[in-house]
From Swiss-Prot:
Protein family per UniProt: Belongs to the UPF0102 family.
Cross-referenced InterPro entries: Restrct_endonuc-II-like, tRNA_endonuc-like_dom_sf, UPF0102_YraN-like
Coiled coil residues, start to end: none
One Pfam short name: UPF0102
Protein name as annotated: UPF0102 protein ACIAD1132
Top-level taxonomic group: Bacteria
NCBIfam families associated with the record: PRK12497.1-3, PRK14674.1, YraN family protein
Organism encoding this protein: Acinetobacter baylyi (strain ATCC 33305 / BD413 / ADP1)
GO molecular function (one): nucleic acid binding
């Protein structure tokens, strides 16, 4: 029997990918270039790493719908921040050319104020949502 994922997991995956694409579009519209997407270390993952001039931004992307226990900008726990910081340090050690860049941690959030049908493949951009870009959301 094939490994079947629950509908809500598939839905969350599609919403997450949509949010990452939207966040990247916003960043690129502001002059940032993608360095790497979904960078992994053994402790965590960073959704987007972008650069402009001598500035390097590690971006966490969050998307939430009505029924989630908190708004997107409220769900980044201190433990998650530590994992992102450690992963950023790993990135800088692996790619030393970026060590002289000014680095910061941003969060881009998407909140949908209503439930989204989980059984339908959605074009999330057609739905109403609030978007927030939190620069310097946390520091080392």
């Amino acid at each position: 029997m094939p490994d079947m994922k629950p509908v809500q997991d598939i839905h969350a995956h599609h919403l997450g990918k949509w949010a990452e694409n939207q966040a990247l579009n916003i960043l690129q519209a502001n002059g940032f270039k993608l360095v790497i997407r979904n960078f992994h270390s053994r402790v965590g993952e960073i959704d987007l790493i972008v650069a402009k001039a001598d500035e390097l931004i590690f971006v966490e992307v969050k998307a939430r719908t009505l029924g989630s226990y908190a708004a997107a900008n409220e769900v980044l726990l201190v433990s998650q921040q530590r994992k992102i910081i450690k992963t950023a340090q790993y990135f800088l050690n692996r790619y030393p050319d970026y060590q002289q860049f000014y680095c910061r941690f941003d969060v881009i959030c998407f909140d949908f104020p209503h439930k989204i049908a989980k059984t339908v493949q959605q074009d999330f951009s057609k739905l109403r949502y609030d978007q927030q870009w939190i620069e310097n959301a946390f520091t080392l």
